[in-house]
Amino acid sequence: MLHNIQSILQFLLFVSSVQALETGGLKSKPPNLKLLECFEFKKNYWIVGHAFHTSSVQFKDECLRMCLTSSIRKAKCLSAMHVPNDDECVISDQNQVTKPDLFIENDTPGTFTVNFFRNICVDPPDAEGVDRFEARLQGYKGGEGIIEFAQAVGKNTQVMVVISGLKENSLYEINFLPDTKEKGGQCHRKSRVNGEGKTLMIVETDHTGMAVEPWKVIDFDGFEENVISKTIVVVEKSTQTIVDCGSIRLATASSNSSTTRTSSSTGLKFTTGLLIILVVFLFL
């Protein structure tokens, strides 16, 4: 009888140990290194007065994901601030470059900590003289995202990818279909690539189903390919099934960060100055 009780207790101990190991494995997810590459970290600094979204998240990676995916909704995030004491995430359309006077140090680090992350994927590393294009993925099979292109004359194309809602820990091909011009968002009618098109890159999703590829130069000439209105498809590598797609368009003003805003502001000031000069001249 005693032997049977000991056997049962040993079995229960074994089961609880296995459950503890499984639970521990679930909690310790590997970091998405590509996600982290898109951010420049500075401890105990923040941007004052320019939050456009605040939410409750436990881990900093969740906050960084929110920042990157905001571009899918055409709300450009230039920085993210995570307050671990309060499980709070604040994303902003400004950073220490666009608003240096509002970038201040937390003067009460003993009370709470602020982790500041500048989004360095908002613009390509080589942004001088580039034209910007984008393909907004429609998410008709669950995934949604944006693929951004930047190219200057005589140089290869730079590409950046953010896609969420895909199958976790899986490989996907980003394919360019040169012979298709989709109208009215009908690219979802294709189900397989059947060997057509060109694979621009392969991306890997993390445990949340998110794929990130920071800006990288690829062997592709967008000008030569005349990419406007051509189709980009996201293909699950193992099955060669198309899971997402979008047509390439000129990037919207909100897709370009401080460069667009600065040039627009300069143009507005110049136009205003001309109007003032003209009015003064008329009244002389």
Swiss-Prot record:
**InterPro entries xref list:** Pan_app
Q: Specify the signal sequence span.
A: 1-20
Q: Which Cys residues form disulphide pairs?
A: C38-C121, C63-C89, C67-C77
Annotated keywords: Disulfide bond, Glycoprotein, Membrane, Signal, Transmembrane, Transmembrane helix
Provide the topology term for how it sits in the membrane.
Single-pass membrane protein
Q: Does the keyword Transmembrane helix apply?
A: yes
Q: Name one GO cellular component term.
A: membrane
Glycosylation is annotated at N256
Judging by the UniProt lineage, the source's domain of life is Eukaryota
This chain's source organism reads Caenorhabditis elegans
The identity of this protein, by name, is Uncharacterized protein C34C12.7
Q: Where are the transmembrane segments?
A: 264-284
Q: Where in the cell is it found?
A: Membrane
Q: Which residues form the Apple domain?
A: 38-121
Q: Return the SUPFAM superfamilies for the record.
A: Hairpin loop containing domain-like
